[in-house]
């Protein structure tokens, strides 16, 4: 590889311009192929999975987004849709399944329980799957309609189309991994949220 220094207004050599254009188009081609060939992993936890299974029927035609090939093994999938309540007992197997997926891989959190624990603010329920997995798209609802999952796939496709190559990868203890904030926003704002619900003592005033 050779480097040259020139003025900003100077014309670039034709061979360098052609190579740059080639790699730019190659990035676009790779992004296009990735976003139109998502292979979801068939994994459900509770009632939101029923809506996810409904989205796979011919009525909604998920094949339009290239995501109709449901995989039964994480080693052949690149999209994990977490649908339903994530109990602490299931967090470890879920993370193990995610770690078996090949890079690049993406995660969709489907439903209020997967997003933030939902109405189960108890010790046995993980308060948001983003506390141990890097979530790319959140789907609100209890349960969300299949159309909401369709919109999540479209949003994920637009995100994949703008990701640069190589993807944001850092070297971890077990190999390359995409960086993510391990502290979810729900936990960061928990104290402020709880302060709103505290009632003042009427005797103190």
Curated annotation (Swiss-Prot):
EC category: translocase
EC number(s) on file: 7.1.1.-
Mode of membrane association: Peripheral membrane protein
Any one GO CC term of the record: respiratory chain complex I
One MF term in the entry's GO annotations: NADH:ubiquinone reductase (non-electrogenic) activity
Residues annotated as binding [4Fe-4S] cluster: 47-48, 113, 142
Entry's Gene Ontology BP terms: aerobic respiration; electron transport coupled proton transport
Claim: DNA damage is one of the keywords in the record: no
Compartments (UniProt record): Cell inner membrane
Keywords for this protein: 4Fe-4S, Cell inner membrane, Cell membrane, Iron, Iron-sulfur, Membrane, Metal-binding, NAD, Quinone, Translocase, Transport, Ubiquinone
Catalysis performed (reactions): a quinone + NADH + 5 H(+)(in) = a quinol + NAD(+) + 4 H(+)(out)
Cofactor info, note text: Binds 1 [4Fe-4S] cluster.
Residues of the signal peptide: none
Chief location: membrane
UniProt family annotation: Belongs to the complex I 20 kDa subunit family.
Function: NDH-1 shuttles electrons from NADH, via FMN and iron-sulfur (Fe-S) centers, to quinones in the respiratory chain. The immediate electron acceptor for the enzyme in this species is believed to be ubiquinone. Couples the redox reaction to proton translocation (for every two electrons transferred, four hydrogen ions are translocated across the cytoplasmic membrane), and thus conserves the redox energy in a proton gradient.
Name of the protein this chain belongs to: NADH-quinone oxidoreductase subunit B 2
Organism per entry: Cereibacter sphaeroides (strain ATCC 17029 / ATH 2.4.9)
Gene: nuoB2
């Amino acid at each position: 590889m050779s480097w040259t220094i020139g003025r900003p207004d100077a014309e670039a050599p034709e061979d360098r311009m052609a190579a740059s254009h080639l790699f730019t188009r190659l990035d676009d081609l790779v992004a296009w192929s990735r976003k139109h060939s998502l292979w979801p992993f068939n994994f459900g936890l509770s009632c939101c999975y029923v809506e996810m299974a409904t989205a796979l029927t011919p009525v909604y035609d998920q094949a339009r987004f290239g995501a109709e090939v449901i995989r039964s093994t994480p080693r052949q999938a690149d999209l994990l849709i977490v649908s339903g309540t994530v109990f602490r007992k299931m967090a470890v197997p879920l993370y193990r399944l995610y770690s078996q997926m090949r890079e690049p891989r993406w995660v969709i959190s489907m439903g209020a329980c997967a997003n933030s624990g939902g109405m189960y603010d108890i010790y046995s329920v993980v308060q948001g799957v983003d506390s141990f997995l890097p979530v790319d798209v959140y789907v609100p609802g209890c349960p969300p309609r299949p159309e909401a999952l369709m919109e999540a796939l479209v949003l994920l496709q637009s995100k994949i189309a703008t990701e640069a190559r190589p993807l944001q990868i850092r070297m971890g203890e077990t190999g390359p991994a995409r960086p993510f904030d391990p502290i979810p926003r729900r936990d960061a704002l928990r104290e402020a949220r709880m302060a709103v619900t505290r009632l003042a003592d009427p005797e103190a005033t």
